[in-house]
Amino acid sequence: MDPVVVLLLSLFFLLFLSLWRPSSGRGKLPPGPTPLPIIGNFFQVDMKDIRQSLTNFSKTYGPVYTLYVGSQPTVVLHGYEALKEALVDHGEEFSGRGRLPICEKVAKGQGIAFSHGNVWKATRHFTVKTLRNLGMGKGTIEDKVQEEAKWLVKELKKTNGSPCDPQFIMGCAPGNVICSIILQNRFDYEDKDFLNLIEKVNEAVKIISSPGIQVFNIFPILLDYCPGNHNIYFKNHTWLKSYLLEKIKEHEESLDVSNPRDFIDYFLIERNQENANQWMNYTLEHLAIMVTDLFFAGIETVSSTMRFALLLLMKYPHVTAKVQEEIDHVIGRHRSPCMQDRSHMPYTNAMVHEVQRYIDIGPNGLLHEVTCDTKFRNYFIPKGTAVLTSLTSVLHDSKEFPNPEMFDPGHFLDENGNFKKSDYFIPFSAGKRMCLGESLARMELFLFLTTILQNFKLKSLVDPKDINTTPICSSLSSVPPTFQMRFIPL
């Protein structure tokens, strides 16, 4: 056959496939832009601004629509009503974890974030129970955060008001809180292993949040054959896993079953009990991945939020002035802030909430997956279909938060200046897969930020109006730009 004819027939077949598949292949899936064979909607999504692309699609196809990631459909939920209906009202059906190949390659179905089914339920139950035993939601954890806040102040005072990059210091504070829960002890801010841990977590989050890395998630076959930052991500994970397995071994050698010291001890004790959960994976590798998940969630999320907060507080000095006035009035300068203060500090509480709303730290959270064939609204979503939840569409809803692109603590204040809660405040997602450490993160942000503002004047090296708060990447997590500043003791 003539090569030209073959080429034309091939092109016709591909065109036919692309037009036919959405109508017959999708069945009752929600509507969406027409995908191309093999690559899906890849070229229709701006990888540098996925949030805006999702918003644009919602204007055409509504709050529930379908995008094709490669050849696989992904249902997108846009807006508060769609997310609430799926994650809360149909929580069990939408409680699966979607596939993220670059993360799955290291997690291997283990840990908290990327396990599935009964193993995930057992792992989550153990984690929640153990964190409560270790003081989560109680004064025990608050004491740890307050103590770390004092160390944070000491470390910032060492800068003597000179220009500094706050990235590592802001990572060390929440990092030590997590270490005290998992490994019993905190670390000195100059400890080499500790700094290495913080650095590798920071670097890993930047890598998996970069636009380029999403190509490997869409076409995972490339992971084993192409060079790229994903290899650094794998290397960092290998180091962290080895470090944690070494710590676990030390715990085994010094374990006292009658006196558990930390998260690792509780795991080691339970794995040897006769009535242990049959669905729980009690291997040490599973424990190492669990702890890795806690490090990633507990360090970088809080660290990035605090760095964004510092940028915003310098950019909007009138907000900082109001917060410091409230600190002087309620707390003063001679005692440490505590969580009881929060109810008497509506503006400070509003500021902390507004920082989280404005920066949108996890624009789409982690992918969900339906655990069974699911009827949702007028659509049919087959078991195993990935579900993307646009948290941005809720946190930046213009009806709930007028002028959502403006940083304004007034979004969380009523007409009398009292703190105003909002159901649309879901930076930690919602439903069965929401972040386990939400209460700890909120506590850390309030106590760390109020302690910093109680003790320091924040000084930018550039004019406030020139401060850039745009994330350097935001595919998975919003990462703040690198900057320097001065902490001037008050």
UniProtKB/Swiss-Prot annotation:
The keyword DNA repair does not apply. The lineage of its organism: Eukaryota, Metazoa, Chordata, Craniata, Vertebrata. The gene is Cyp2c13. Liver, and to a lesser extent in prostate, kidney, heart and brain. PROSITE patterns: CYTOCHROME_P450. Its cofactor is heme. Changing residue 234 to L: In G- phenotype. Changing residue 237 to Y: In G- phenotype. Keywords: Endoplasmic reticulum, Heme, Iron, Membrane, Metal-binding, Microsome, Monooxygenase, Oxidoreductase. Induction: P450 can be induced to high levels in liver and other tissues by various foreign compounds, including drugs, pesticides, and carcinogens. It is an enzyme of class 1 (oxidoreductase). This is Cytochrome P450 2C13, male-specific. Cytochromes P450 are a group of heme-thiolate monooxygenases. In liver microsomes, this enzyme is involved in an NADPH-dependent electron transport pathway. It oxidizes a variety of structurally unrelated compounds, including steroids, fatty acids, and xenobiotics.
